């Protein structure tokens, strides 16, 4: 199902919003908004006064009072319309999905087997516990859990993302789990970004074997391949493939070798294999050094130099060891994403500090950080180091945002002010974060910050305009309205409004019309450009502060001239 993009003023939504705006004129609906309730009460009072003047019960200009009451009602109606239109736009997508459910049919299985007999039933009749079979080209009939199989699913109607995503057994997804998460993102001034997949393409590949002195390259490649046989990461598979390409070392099966695979952990930071009496490990430099020294060995100086050379080129060095003997270095090469440096420059203009988080050593991290243009980096990062770094920034009064996908990221995600967990990550990470990226794209954190900034800018701009607008309105109408009582105020009547009645009526009409003109701005949002806080403040004050002062003077004067020409005041 494709996602229908809503126009700013969809005809169907406009009609519904007008209907809802009239319904909201009831006292019960108005009571929920104290400010508009005061205007509503004034409208009722002005209407009663108009009726009293028409019937001759009290003296006064029924025309003037009637026009005032009419525009007060318009003010309430326009405010209701703006609220109803915003609500209608947010509900439109959900209603379209409900419409799909009413017309969609599902294959409900009679038994929990994919080959069981199925009944075609309307999606609306599905209940909790039903098992549904979905085939290629089908609409997903309802929300549920995938218990068997997998598929590429178009979720654009829900997420707005056009690219299909993989949904399979054991997967799950959520969206924003913390209500103020996006708003908080607008105040973020430190971004912690994982190197792999965010700053780099995330497909590190083994590019070279660099043996230690006295070790031939084939011996190193053989040991590296054995240590990677059960390693299902892209890096591990690339090591196996490189050894096969270079030395025709065929891939072997761990079980047939009667070997024990030692998986990677965030604490050990190495993996490997135990086979016969051989104990082979590959991992980060510091982890292998500790391993060698704990087994009574010595870390060779030539390997240290090779590690440094690999790191200076921006590649990641992995060291291979058998027992306490260091065999050499594997170089893993990744590529920095195109355009990422420019994006970091924009964030810097906004006053946001970017910090790259990586398990690489300091030399590799420094090389990639310089290439990518980040402000700082945390090398050889452990879960404890990430958590400590976040707490350090928060102690300095900063708001921190980060991404993560693993169980070891959960403590840091829980500590961060804005935490975006990857949908492809573990359940612990998703529960710790206050947002989940359905597309598992860590770069989305930058987009979240942009959206948060735009929300804050829109709110601030409208508030600035509103305050300046009110100041200008009162400065414009008070001298004219009270000049007869206090002649000294004529000196402040710089606009030369025709009469006190004209001044009041012009202000009331302008107040109603400005609501309509501000609706597109409120719905679409203020256009956002990466600027520093001071530059952004100056820009808003010039556009919305000065604009809020100038627009009422011009608008009220134009309305005053029209009222005078029409002899309505």
From Swiss-Prot:
InterPro entries for this protein: ATPase_P-typ_cyto_dom_N, ATPase_P-typ_P_site, ATPase_P-typ_transduc_dom_A_sf, HAD-like_sf, HAD_sf, P-type_ATPase_bsu_IA, P_typ_ATPase, P_typ_ATPase_HD_dom
Active-site residue numbers: 194 (4-aspartylphosphate intermediate)
Keyword terms: ATP-binding, Cell inner membrane, Cell membrane, Ion transport, Magnesium, Membrane, Metal-binding, Nucleotide-binding, Phosphoprotein, Potassium, Potassium transport, Translocase, Transmembrane, Transmembrane helix, Transport
Membrane topology, as annotated: Multi-pass membrane protein
Keyword Transmembrane helix: yes
Catalytic activity: K(+)(out) + ATP + H2O = K(+)(in) + ADP + phosphate + H(+)
Transmembrane segments: 34-54, 58-78, 475-495, 503-523, 543-563
Binding site for Mg(2+): 405, 409
Its EC number(s): 7.2.2.6
Compartments it resides in: Cell inner membrane
Protein residues bound to ATP: 231, 235, 264-271, 282
Keyword Cell inner membrane attached: yes
Role this protein plays: Part of the high-affinity ATP-driven potassium transport (or Kdp) system, which catalyzes the hydrolysis of ATP coupled with the electrogenic transport of potassium into the cytoplasm. This subunit is responsible for energy coupling to the transport system and for the release of the potassium ions to the cytoplasm.
This protein's name: Putative potassium-transporting ATPase ATP-binding subunit
Gene: kdpB
């Amino acid at each position: 199902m494709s996602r229908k993009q809503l126009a700013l003023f969809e005809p169907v939504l406009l009609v519904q919003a007008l209907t809802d705006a009239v319904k909201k004129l009831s006292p019960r609906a108005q009571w929920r908004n104290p400010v508009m309730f005061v205007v509503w009460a004034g409208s009722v009072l002005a209407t009663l006064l108009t009726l009293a003047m028409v019937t001759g019960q009290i003296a006064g200009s029924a025309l003037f009072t009637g026009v005032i009451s009419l525009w007060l009602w318009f003010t309430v109606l326009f405010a209701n319309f703006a609220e109803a239109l915003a609500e209608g736009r947010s509900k439109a997508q959900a209603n379209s999905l409900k419409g799909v459910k009413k017309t969609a049919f599902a294959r409900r299985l009679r038994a929990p087997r994919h080959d069981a007999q199925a009944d075609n039933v309307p999606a609306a009749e599905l209940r909790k516990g039903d098992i549904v079979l979905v085939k290629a080209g089908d609409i997903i009939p309802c929300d549920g859990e995938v218990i068997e199989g997998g598929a590429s699913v178009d979720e654009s109607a829900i997420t707005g993302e056009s690219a299909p995503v993989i949904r399979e057994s054991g997967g799950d997804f959520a969206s924003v789990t913390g209500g103020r998460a996006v708003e908080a993102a607008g105040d973020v001034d430190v971004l912690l970004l994982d190197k792999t997949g965010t700053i780099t393409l995330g497909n590190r590949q083994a590019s070279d074997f660099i043996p230690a002195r006295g070790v031939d390259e084939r011996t190193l490649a053989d040991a590296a391949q054995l240590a990677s046989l059960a390693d299902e990461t892209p890096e591990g598979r690339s090591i196996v493939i490189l050894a096969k390409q270079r030395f025709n070392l065929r891939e072997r099966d761990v079980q047939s070798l009667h070997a024990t695979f030692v998986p990677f952990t965030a604490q050990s930071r190495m993996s490997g294999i135990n086979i016969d009496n051989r104990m082979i490990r590959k991992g980060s430099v510091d982890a292998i050094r500790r391993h060698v020294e704990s087994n009574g060995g010595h870390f060779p100086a030539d390997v240290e130099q090779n590690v440094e050379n690999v790191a200076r080129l921006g590649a990641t060095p992995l060291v291979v060891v058998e027992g306490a003997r260091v065999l050499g270095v594997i170089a893993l090469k990744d590529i920095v994403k195109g355009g990422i440096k420019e994006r970091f420059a924009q964030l810097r203009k906004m006053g946001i500090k970017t910090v790259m988080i990586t398990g690489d050593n300091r030399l590799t991290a420094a090389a990639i950080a310089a290439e990518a243009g980040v402000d700082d980096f945390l090398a050889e990062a452990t879960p404890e180091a990430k958590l400590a770094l976040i707490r350090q920034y928060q102690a300095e009064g900063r708001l921190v945002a980060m991404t993560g996908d693993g169980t070891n990221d959960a403590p840091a995600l829980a500590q961060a002010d804005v935490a975006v967990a990857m949908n492809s990550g573990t359940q612990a990470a998703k529960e710790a974060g206050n947002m989940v990226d359905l597309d598992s794209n860590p770069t989305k954190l930058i987009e979240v910050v942009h959206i948060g900034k735009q929300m804050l800018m829109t709110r601030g701009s409208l508030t600035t305009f509103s305050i300046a607008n009110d100041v200008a309105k009162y400065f414009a109408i008070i001298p004219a309205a009270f000049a007869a009582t206090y002649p000294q105020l004529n000196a402040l009547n710089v606009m030369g409004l025709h009469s006190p009645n004209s001044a009041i009526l012009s202000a009331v009409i302008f107040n109603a019309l400005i609501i309509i003109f501000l609706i597109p701005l409120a719905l679409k949002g203020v256009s956002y450009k990466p600027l520093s806080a001071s530059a952004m403040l100056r820009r808003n004050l010039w556009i919305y502060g000065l604009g809020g002062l100038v627009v009422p003077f011009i608008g009220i004067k134009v309305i005053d001239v029209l009222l005078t020409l029409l002899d309505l005041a």
